[in-house]
Amino acid sequence: MSFASETKKELTNLEVKDCCINAELSALIRMNGALSFTNRHLVLDVQTENAAIARRIYTLLKKQYDVSVELLVRKKMRLKKNNVYIVRFSENAKAILEDLKILGENFVFERSISKELVKKRCCKRSYMRGAFLAGGSVNNPETSSYHLEIFSLYKEHNDSLCDLLNEFQLNSKTLERKKGYITYLKEAEKITEFLNVIGAHNSLLRFEDVRIVRDMRNSVNRLVNCETANLNKTIGASLRQVENIKYIDERIGLEALPEKLREIAQLRIDYQEVTLKELGEMVASGKISKSGINHRLRKLDEIAEQLRTGQTVTLK
């Protein structure tokens, strides 16, 4: 089961306050519902591929309105042949849709979220939960990028949903897609805050656990890469220094060098793997700083370059 599916399963098991039922139902029915007329009666079908969500819609409708509700199961014939669950009711359908602020006067479809429906903060949370159940998805935290989105068919609903999320400082944004619009979150911290707001606390903990391990692994990898780069740089410099010292030895002999340079040259030949700091601690005449060692080695590089190019060699 995907992380998104596990999150939705957790949400369908939450208790909902009486004052919040309409908010959650409104989101679920608005985003997954379809109206039709059968024998001059208005029929509403709410469709989902998630059995737990279908049961929740069925339960909330029965609890809030005590109407006759059917729960149908169909098999998809294309692509993945998953079950499709349809919650169907016609009894008082128009009155229920008006109560849920989906239909207005004169059978006008309300495309934005009603302010009256989400007056209380708990009702705002419930609407967001219903919207996520109806059209939401979230990436597994183990994947390469963090992403949570909720799909809406209408721009007005998408914009009002984005505004609702941002009342909780979630920094949500909107984007037009081919067949609708999405409200989305890209920051890991905001995704965990959203999961907290809608009550998916177990999913939040799992998300955070995976994120912490992933971020720690990335930090370790960055540190290792940095150390490797530094080590490669050190090895490269050491090999260059040894090559230059050997070239000097072949051309004029190390004996021709001043004592200070000759001493460092011999140490570098003998201890090619050590750092400049360690090299400085090996000087017989007394400890030399890292910068002092570096200065002398650069002087040896300079002498080697002068020998290669036929310039006048400066030994001091």
Swiss-Prot record:
Tell me which domain of life the UniProt entry assigns to the organism this sequence originates from: Bacteria
Signal sequence region = none
SUPFAM superfamilies according to UniProt? Homing endonucleases
Q: Does the keyword Protein transport belong to this entry?
A: no
Taking the first listed entry, what is the main subcellular location of this protein, grouped into a coarse class?
Answer: cytoplasm
Q: Which UniProt keywords apply?
A: Cell cycle, Cell division, Cytoplasm, DNA-binding
Listed Gene3D superfamilies: Homing endonucleases (3.10.28.10)
Question: Any idea where this protein resides?
Answer: Cytoplasm, Nucleoid
What happens biologically when this protein's gene is inactivated, per the record? Mutant grows slower and cells are longer compared to the wild-type strain. Mutation has a relatively mild effect on the sporulation. Mutant is sensitive to reduced FtsZ concentrations. Deletion of the gene in a zapA mutant background results in very filamentous cells that are blocked in proper Z-ring formation. Mutant shows increased internucleoid distances.
Q: What triggers its expression?
A: Constitutively expressed throughout the growth phase.
Among the GO biological process terms of this entry, one is: regulation of sporulation
Q: Which GO-annotated molecular functions does the record name?
A: DNA binding
**Where does the chain cross the membrane?**
none
Q: What does the UniProt function comment say about this protein?
A: Involved in cell division and chromosome segregation. May influence the activity of FtsZ. Binds DNA, but does not seem to function as a transcription factor.
Name assigned to this protein: Probable cell division protein WhiA
